[in-house]
Amino acid sequence: MTATAQQLEYLKNSIKSIQDYPKPGILFRDVTSLLEDPKAYALSIELLVERYKNAGITKVVGTEARGFLFGAPVALEMGVGFVPVRKPRKLPRETIAESYELEYGTDQLEIHVDAIKPGDKVLVVDDLLATGGTIEATVKLIRRLGGEVTDAAFIINLFDLGGEQRLEKQGITSYSLVPFPGH
């Protein structure tokens, strides 16, 4: 099933916009309101699965924390493993880490060293693409373990914040269901 304009509009309307959150001047796109609507949540998973089910994906990686909410059901429906990428010291087995820049400083993500095997074809899933820093760090982790990443899928793309272009420079095609301006 290819997404229809009506389906995509339904998804867009299920996402609430919160003015001045988390600080004045920010218009926050709240994907948790989509999760509250079982029809919208199921549709978002269905559309992502439909797009990637014949792409030879062997693992789906989701970034903490909302990436888990979309990545795990996509992996389950596709019959492939799900791999969480988490903040430091949240994974119990041996990990590798990658730092990335935030607006005011740096942060770090980790992945289990045995979660991705050389040659795995990996789809990265997250709730939202903004500047692309989190996904870029996630892709670096996967590639360090020998995985191949060509695509990243999102529910929301804040299209004017440069995330798509940043990922393109890394050879990653981004796909999103709902575009919103970031400013």
Swiss-Prot record:
Q: Does the keyword Metal-binding apply?
A: no
Q: Report the locations given in the UniProt record.
A: Cytoplasm
The gene is apt
Q: Know the name of this protein?
A: Adenine phosphoribosyltransferase
GO MF term set: adenine phosphoribosyltransferase activity
Q: Which reaction does it catalyse?
A: AMP + diphosphate = 5-phospho-alpha-D-ribose 1-diphosphate + adenine
A single GO BP term for this record reads: purine ribonucleoside salvage
The record's comment on protein family reads:
Belongs to the purine/pyrimidine phosphoribosyltransferase family.
Pathway, according to UniProt? Purine metabolism; AMP biosynthesis via salvage pathway; AMP from adenine: step 1/1
Quaternary structure (record)? Homodimer.
Q: What are the annotated GO cellular component locations?
A: cytosol
**What EC class does the entry list?**
transferase
Main function: Catalyzes a salvage reaction resulting in the formation of AMP, that is energically less costly than de novo synthesis.
Q: Which UniProt keywords apply?
A: Cytoplasm, Glycosyltransferase, Purine salvage, Transferase
**What EC number(s) is this enzyme filed under?**
2.4.2.7
Q: Which Pfam families match?
A: Pribosyltran (PF00156)
Annotated InterPro entries: Ade_phspho_trans (IPR005764), Adenine_PRTase (IPR050120), PRibTrfase_dom (IPR000836), PRTase-like (IPR029057)
- The residues that cross the membrane are none
Q: What NCBIfam families does this protein's entry cite?
A: apt, PRK02304.1-1, PRK02304.1-2, PRK02304.1-3, PRK02304.1-5
